[in-house]
UniProtKB/Swiss-Prot annotation:
Organism of origin: Escherichia coli (strain K12)
Protein name: Phosphatidylglycerophosphatase B
Subcellular location as annotated: Cell inner membrane; Cell outer membrane
Any one GO molecular-function label of the UniProt entry: diacylglycerol diphosphate phosphatase activity
Reactions catalysed: a 1,2-diacyl-sn-glycero-3-phospho-(1'-sn-glycero-3'-phosphate) + H2O = a 1,2-diacyl-sn-glycero-3-phospho-(1'-sn-glycerol) + phosphate; a 1,2-diacyl-sn-glycerol 3-diphosphate + H2O = a 1,2-diacyl-sn-glycero-3-phosphate + phosphate + H(+); a 1,2-diacyl-sn-glycero-3-phosphate + H2O = a 1,2-diacyl-sn-glycerol + phosphate; di-trans,octa-cis-undecaprenyl diphosphate + H2O = di-trans,octa-cis-undecaprenyl phosphate + phosphate + H(+)
Activity regulation statement: Inhibited by Mn(2+) ions. Inhibited by phosphatidylethanolamine (PE).
CDD domains per record: PAP2_like
Span list, region Phosphatase sequence motif III: 200-211
Record: active site: 163, 207
Domain of life from the UniProt record: Bacteria
Annotated transmembrane regions: 2-24, 55-66, 72-94, 162-176, 183-202, 209-232
Role played: Catalyzes the dephosphorylation of diacylglycerol diphosphate (DGPP) to phosphatidate (PA) and the subsequent dephosphorylation of PA to diacylglycerol (DAG). Also has undecaprenyl pyrophosphate phosphatase activity, required for the biosynthesis of the lipid carrier undecaprenyl phosphate. Can also use lysophosphatidic acid (LPA) and phosphatidylglycerophosphate as substrates. The pattern of activities varies according to subcellular location, PGP phosphatase activity is higher in the cytoplasmic membrane, whereas PA and LPA phosphatase activities are higher in the outer membrane.
Length: 254
């Protein structure tokens, strides 16, 4: 448990570098970012947004199983644990959002530029909020259509970031489960992807840096427990002797 907690803590620290740096810098979101950067951020965030998030989940689960070489029974147990970790994280996120009720950056911007009081905005039902955003931004040339559509769908509260929790959970699961097998490329790709998802939430006006920080910390706690459970139920996560030889050979060739 301690080794898993240490590994995932290092991964969480790496994920926290970007949002903490942005937080300290005092950066504030404003519409009108470079179009190519904004479009790239949108497509990165779409890898987590439904329905694509389900596809991402299934692809990553399949890859994890291949890397871990689990038997069928153990595979189903691991799938249940991984799915539970993601679902519990999303449930915790929803509960905190309802309690804290922090407005999104773009909602604050709507209040300043379109005179829509934040309190009144959030008293509306979700569908009504989406329609209001659509009406108010119909003539807004500085906001691309894809971003307007995204805002119409994402009219909930900001704190903490659900997209960050999804991506960070997978990245930290990689650190916890795949590091003993030295799947360093997979770990690096997922850490970069998770950081990209976090950055996209800032650029799209969906979250504040603190939303990302807290979401990452929650993900770390959940993943530490999930990997511990996986080890208790499925057995040691360390590779057997035969696989250790293969890992050593792979490292020599790289």
């Amino acid at each position: 448990m301690r080794s898993i907690a240490r590994r995932t803590a290092v991964g969480a620290a790496l994920l926290l570098v970007m949002p903490v740096a942005v937080w300290i810098s005092g950066w504030r979101w404003q519409p009108g970012e470079q179009s190519w950067l904004l479009k790239a951020a949108f497509w990165v965030t779409e890898t987590v947004t439904q329905p694509w998030g389900v596809i991402t989940h299934l692809i990553l689960f399949g890859w994890f199983l291949w890397c871990l070489r689990f038997r069928i029974k153990a595979a189903f147990v691991l799938f249940a644990i991984l799915a539970a970790a993601i679902l519990v994280g999303q449930g915790v996120k929803s509960w905190i959002k309802d309690k804290v009720q922090e407005p999104r950056p773009f909602v604050i911007w709507l209040e300043k530029t379109h005179h829509i009081p934040v309190d009144e905005f959030y008293t509306l039902k979700r569908a009504e909020r989406g329609n209001l955003v659509k009406e108010q931004l119909a003539e807004e040339k500085n906001i691309p259509q894809y971003l307007r559509s995204h805002w119409q769908k994402e009219t909930g509260f900001a704190f903490p970031s659900g997209h960050t929790m999804f991506a960070a959970s997978w990245a930290l699961l990689a650190v916890g489960l795949l590091w003993p097998r030295r799947r360093t490329l997979t770990i690096a790709i997922l850490l970069v992807w998770a950081t990209g998802v976090m950055g996209s939430r800032l650029l799209l006006g969906m979250h504040w840096p603190r939303d990302l920080v807290v979401a990452t910390l929650i993900s770390w706690a959940l993943v530490a427990v999930a990997t511990w459970l996986a080890q208790r139920i499925c057995g040691p996560l360390t590779p057997p002797a035969e696989e250790n030889r293969e890992i050593a050979q792979r490292e020599q060739e790289s």
